[in-house]
Amino acid sequence: MTDDPAATPRPETSVNARPAFSGQAPIKAEYLINTTPIVESASASELNNIHPDDAAEGRTDSRDSRDGRDRPDNKRRKPNKQDKKDKKGQNKGRHFPVIREASVRICRAWETTGICDRADKGDCRYAHSWEGYFEVKPNDISYRPDWSLVGEAPFVVEGERVVGGEDVVGKTLDLDTVCPVLKDLGYCPFGWRCRFLGAHVKRVAAAVDGEKEKEAGPEKRMGEWQVENWVQSEVENGWKQKETNWPEHEVLNALRRSTASFPFSEAYLKKVDPDKPFTLQNKKPTKQQPHKRKNNVLDEEEAANGPTGIPSAGDDEENAMNATENERNEEKGKVYGETEAIDVPLRPEEKRRLNWEGGRYLAPLTTVGNLPFRRLCVDYGATITVSEMALAQPLVYGAKEEWALVRRHESEKMFGVQVAGGFPNRMVPAAEVIANTIGKGGGVDFVDVNMGCPIDLVFNQGAGSALMDSPGRLGKLLVGMNRALGDIPLTVKFRTGVAHGKPNAHKLIPRFVTEWGAGALTIHGRSRQQRYSKPADWEYIKTCVTALRESVADANLPPVPIFGNGDCFSAASYYEEMDRSGVDGVMVARGALIKPWIFTEIKERREWDISAVERLEGIKKFAEFGLSHWGSDTQGVNTTRRFLCEALSFQHRYIPIGLLERLPAKLNERPPAYRGRNELETLLASPFAGDWVKISEMFLGKVDEGFSFVPKHKSNAYGGEEAQG
């Protein structure tokens, strides 16, 4: 018998008889469905590139012209360097079209008030009648939270659909469905557009002649049906739909038009960078007359009077220079008149204390760290959460999409906003506008500076981990933000350094606290060059903890919390890393993406062999939270579906601990092909995007035509993800 393992038959029942592959999870033999070890061509990225999958539905020919299979002689060429590169990394340029109701789009002004000024002038392109809308509106999604979840198909034991009637409205209704938004909020702001409409309508007497006009807009009447619990929610005391951090419309308009006032930023930047004039405009300001805006940008009333409460562009400098010292110093920590003190951080006693010891900290995560996901992690036991990374420049320019990232749910008891940028002239104004818009109402407990993001797009602009090699610029940035934020603490998240083998975090840490005023620190135990390819260096994190403790003691400062980050995937690893390094806690990033219930494990100090049904319960919660956040109309349902699939593109990597030969599980271990303990567990482990969509249909109904999903990472998150530091 030859010694070649490829040619020698191996006993199928012996795991030890199979050669060990680096990074392969040790799954018990009885759950393996293929005794041949996985090879590169059987990776998850290959499985998701099979042509019958969602991404290839538009093909008329299943052959791939790129690899030469469509050549007449059918000779496949050898893969070149570009082919190999295309099969790994991110699926860049993903496009998710906004899917709304087909054909008919209702005017929102008419829908909410019954009045549309543009319609009277004949220039509104939207519909002002519900007639025709229900001809194309999809049927209600059938959903009840009390439906049983089981481990075998169909996985969700549904009840029968109760159709409302044969009329145009009734035939779309399911009178037995439950609206998750109504269940969560007590009302539904989506009215007739809700895809769970049967949960909040009732049959009334048919309308008589002459009452047809009353069926429009806010009268909430359509034929013999009347919608109930339809409330157009408004922001009250900073809160709307159990969420806060809704900047006022006038504030965003002022930011977009560069008419907002930044008195502290202007004074500070003039002090620390006198050679760089302060401007918020996209292009250099000229001495000519102000640019005349088009009528469709600024309505007549605002053009005449200016946005309420926001100084006009011409008043900014005069107001900043002429305000009395008392007026300028009204907000704590913002010293506009005392220029000799403006470039030093506030004293620790002037800031709120961050008592984070033992806190369960969810990392800021691009795309997948959205509000519904954070809410799910809080439900599992997370106590500290941070927004997705927001870029400083779009915040200062009033970009609606960027401000949506800082939204906070009422369940997030300790919440921070993470900001990325490379220069003081953007980061300091961003801190000032955050403090003035959402900081006053308690919408943010701390602001975190991203100093760890490794991606080229951020790094090449001097932001993220690039800041670690520019301590002079970094110091100006942090001190300015520290003062602009007033009593709101400033925290930093950073890596060991930029280049592998040349760490410099231990040199910066004493300055973070004693010179620049950071209120808490988080260190990711890898360099920018390493990304996520090597294990986190917890010995170096221990060195950094020692450097912090010594510098704080020497300066006679109160304790400053420091968290470690890297490879935490179980309660055992969490407490082992804490004990080994001396950190106050461990920030959880990828581990939470793959198993959000890790926070329950940490809280209860146990390894949870979670069942497939319990995992499906978590997926159902995410769907409910997503509908409350993004909406229960067609557009909201599809947005929720998209982000649910994003979550499943990570969660499918979880290997049930009951299937493993050893514990704890390791974050970067890939499983060979295996089956679960029941049919549902096998489905939840599927690397196919089509199966993730199938899982979403259990709670969000059948997919609409035109919906498709392409995972963000070709390797389905096996070490290739880009996170915010």
UniProtKB/Swiss-Prot annotation:
SUPFAM superfamilies attached to this UniProt entry: FMN-linked oxidoreductases
Active site, per annotation: C453 (proton donor)
Transmembrane segments: none
Subcellular location: Cytoplasm; Nucleus
Pfam families: Dus
Zinc finger (C3H1-type): 101-131, 178-203
Chief location of this protein within or outside the cell: cytoplasm
Gene Ontology MF, one: RNA binding
Keyword NADP: yes
Cofactors: FMN
Region (Disordered): 1-26, 43-95, 275-337
CDD domains on file: DUS_like_FMN
Compositional bias annotation for Basic residues: 284-295
GO cellular component, one term: cytoplasm
Biased segments, Basic and acidic residues type: 51-73, 80-89, 325-337
Organism superkingdom: Eukaryota
Recorded catalytic activity of this chain's protein: 5,6-dihydrouridine(47) in tRNA + NAD(+) = uridine(47) in tRNA + NADH + H(+); 5,6-dihydrouridine(47) in tRNA + NADP(+) = uridine(47) in tRNA + NADPH + H(+); a 5,6-dihydrouridine in mRNA + NAD(+) = a uridine in mRNA + NADH + H(+); a 5,6-dihydrouridine in mRNA + NADP(+) = a uridine in mRNA + NADPH + H(+)
Family to which the UniProt record says this protein belongs: Belongs to the Dus family. Dus3 subfamily.
Its biological purpose: Catalyzes the synthesis of dihydrouridine, a modified base found in the D-loop of most tRNAs. Specifically modifies U47 in cytoplasmic tRNAs. Catalyzes the synthesis of dihydrouridine in some mRNAs, thereby affecting their translation.
Protein name per the record: tRNA-dihydrouridine(47) synthase [NAD(P)(+)]
Lineage, highest ranks first: Eukaryota, Fungi, Dikarya, Basidiomycota, Agaricomycotina
